[in-house]
Amino acid sequence: MKKNNKALVALGVVTLAMSIVGSTMAQSAPVTLTVSSDLPLQGGSADQSESTNNVIKLLLKQVKNKAGKFNIKFKMYDDSTAAKGSWDDAQCAANAQAHVANKSEVAVMGTYNSGCAKIIVPVLNQDPKGPMVMVSNANTNPGLTKAWNPGEPTKYYPTGFRNYFRVVTTDDFQGSAAAQFAQSQGVKSVYVLNDTQTYGQGVAQAFTTEANKLKMTVLSAGPAGEGWDAKQPNYEALFTKIKALNPDMIYIGGIFDLNGGQLVKDKVKVLGDNTKVKMMMPDGFTGYPDFLALPEADGAFLSFTGLSIDLFPKNGKAASFQKDYLKAYGKAPTSSFSVYGGAAMQAILDAISRSNGTRKDVFLKMKSVNIPAVKSVVGTSIQFDDAGDTIYHDITILVVKNNTETTLKKITVK
């Protein structure tokens, strides 16, 4: 009997030891967190969005799907619909709820469209376990982070916490740089168009404001020019009206997805090619193979709210990442925006690596992100000001030549 008691005691000790070891192992098992992208995967932006997701996948592979002590899982959300062929308000609203409901998700890379961000950000801001962070590679509307339209940006942050960040600069700088460049090309009169959406109206307004400051003659009425209807079959009547005013340039504020191809075709058909009457667009027309394939796009000027890939440093992470992407996918990234998606994800991973893995702590760590230029996929350091904006105000000017975006110059707006 005594012998059996000893056996039982020994068994108990072993069981307790195994329990302690098992508990310790369970506590030290790596935690998996989810990061996501929220992009339009259908319609005109599909190629660019696919390229952005590919950049992120490659970046995650290079860091072995780790951020500090955490394993990282990547989830892709689609904020577009097949019916609309672009981002959709209702889909953006649904995605916002899905981000919050996904218990392992701690941060969102996106969105591409500023209007979609204005729907999602307030929902993430009010997440009881957050706020949840969103870092955009492409939103350029100023109102997300600074005073622009009435109530902006306060209405996007009901809790008072700024959970939104972006790695590209804003349209107040883009519009100013575009107008300055237009003047340098001898433009004295301009007709401004916008796509009637958040982004298009914002950049058209910024261009118009700067053009007026530069004493250019703005022939269009209103602070953001004239809106075009994306559902129109053609725009010949619009350009026939404009032709009578004899403008030196047409400035098109908007995105290519909204029937931009037809707009460009009819501009050239009625007003002549882009040497006769100049044409300029913002970054909502960059990165679209269908736009570059148009004969009517030749000679069009473009602006981009950051550095074009051509302007990335020829050393460091920016250079090596371009080589790695080409090797992995057999072609270069579709757009600079795609690579800035990688920069946005680098910021997110840095914050996660220094956090305790909760949404709230990832948010708190975002404020101190500081990735040196040599380690950045875009070749400039990744840092944010108090509003959540990048500290850089670089605008790249490009021209379409032989179906390719060709870099002309960089303008740094003060």
Where are these regions (language model features)?
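Solvent-exposed loop/turn segments at secondary-structure junctions
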Residues: L41-G44, D79-A83, N113-K118, N139-L144, ...
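Periplasmic-binding protein-like
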Residues: S37, H99-N113, P131-N137, Y191-N194, ...
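Segments of small-molecule ligand-sensing domains
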Residues: D324-S338, L349-T407
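Extracellular/periplasmic Venus flytrap/periplasmic-binding protein
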Residues: G85, K103, G151-V270, L311-G316, ...
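Short, low-complexity disordered leader/linker segments with a strong preference
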Residues: M1-T34, N65-G68, T412-K414
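Extracellular/periplasmic periplasmic-binding protein-like sensory domains
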Residues: G151, V264-G342, E405-T412
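Extracytoplasmic "Venus flytrap"
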Residues: S36-V55, V63, A67, Y77-W87, ...
